[in-house]
Amino acid sequence: MSDTVLAARDGAVTTVTINRPAQRNAVDRETAAALAAAFRAFEQDDTAAVAVLTGAAGHFCAGADLRAFAEGRGNRVAPDGDGPMGPTRMMLSKPVIAAVEGYAVAGGLELACWCDLRVAAADAVFGVFCRRWGVPLIDGGTIRLTRLIGQSRALDM
C-alpha cells in the first residue's frame, strides 16, 4: 500500500487515513488507487466489521489534486472501474463512517457522501467548491448529496 493512504486495524474496526497533509489530503491518481485498494481489502476481510475514513493532520479531503491535473497526472476518469476519487463507485456490504475534520470539499465531499455515516467536528467545512472552476461533482456526488440533505440545501452549497 502507498504511503498516501494508511490502513490500521483495532479489533473489528479498520481506519483508512488519507495521508497527504501538505496537500490538505487532496487525492491524486496514486492516492485514489490506494484508497480503492484499501476498501477492497476491507470488504474482503471477514474479521473487519466497520471502516472509518479520515484524513491526516486535521484535514478530511480537499478534493482532487488540481496541481496533478495541471501537470497532466490527473485522476482516472473512465466510465468503468474505480472512480476518480478511488472507492466512490464501490458498493460495500459493511458500513463506512466518515470522520470529518477541516475541509470536505469537492471530491472530498463526494467521499464523505459515499460513506454510510458522517461524523463531523464542530469546525468541519462541507462544500462544492469545485463549481467555482466550472467542475461538477463527477462521481455520484450530486445524487448522493441531494438524497442526504435535500435539493434546496444542496443547491445552497
Predicted regions and their residues:
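Conserved CoA-thioester-binding segment of acyl-CoA-metabolizing enzymes
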Residues: M1-A56
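Hydrophobic/aromatic residues within transmembrane alpha-helices
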Residues: V16, L53, D65, L111-C113
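An acidic, glycine-rich surface segment that forms the CoA-thioester-binding/catalytic face
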Residues: A32-A36, R40, Q44, L66-E101
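Short glycine-rich anion-binding loops that position phosphate/pyrophosphate groups of nucleotides
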Residues: A57-H59, G102-Y103
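Amphipathic alpha-helical interaction surfaces in cytosolic regulatory modules
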Residues: G58-L66
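Short glycine-/acidic-enriched loop or helix-start segments at secondary-structure transitions
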Residues: A62-G63, E71, G108-L109
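Crotonase-fold acyl-CoA enzyme core
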Residues: M90-M157
